[in-house]
Amino acid sequence: MICEVGPRDGLQNEKRILSISHKVELIDRLTEAGFKAIEVGSFMNPIAVPQMADTDEVFKRINQKPGVEYGAIIANLKGVERAFLCGCKKVKLNVSTSIQHNLANLNKTPEESIESFKICAETARNKGMDISGSISMAFGSPWE
């Protein structure tokens, strides 16, 4: 299934932080447009990714339509907990093939990330959440 990642990947590096209501409107319009999978945001450190600091509240306010999968990226156990508490039912773990990119995003090597993801995946599964994974920089990296 193709997942629309604009609300997360498209907004996370913007200098201007969109309001919660604008993010909710964007996601609701994507739902109305017929997308079956939408990446709402991420549960990363709010200091590191301030554009995603309000993902918890966005999840609570979007109009979730049956048959549409709403998910988010997590990086650690705190992210799993935040996702669970706001009703997120699908989390994604992401690792980069680029050591420099992975260090910049997660402050860990790809190998360290994969190891730490094991407990995240187990915890999410025990909470009844769906889990997926993704690989960044699979076809090359401008970081190296």
Model regions and ranges:
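Conserved, mostly hydrophobic/aromatic
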Residues: 10, 30, 83, 91, ...
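Active-site mouth loops of central-metabolism enzymes
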Residues: 3-22, 68-77, 102-110, 137-144
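Non-catalytic positions within long, well-ordered alpha-helices that form the structural scaffold/packing
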Residues: 31-34, 84, 125
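Catalytic cores of alpha/beta
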Residues: 75-88
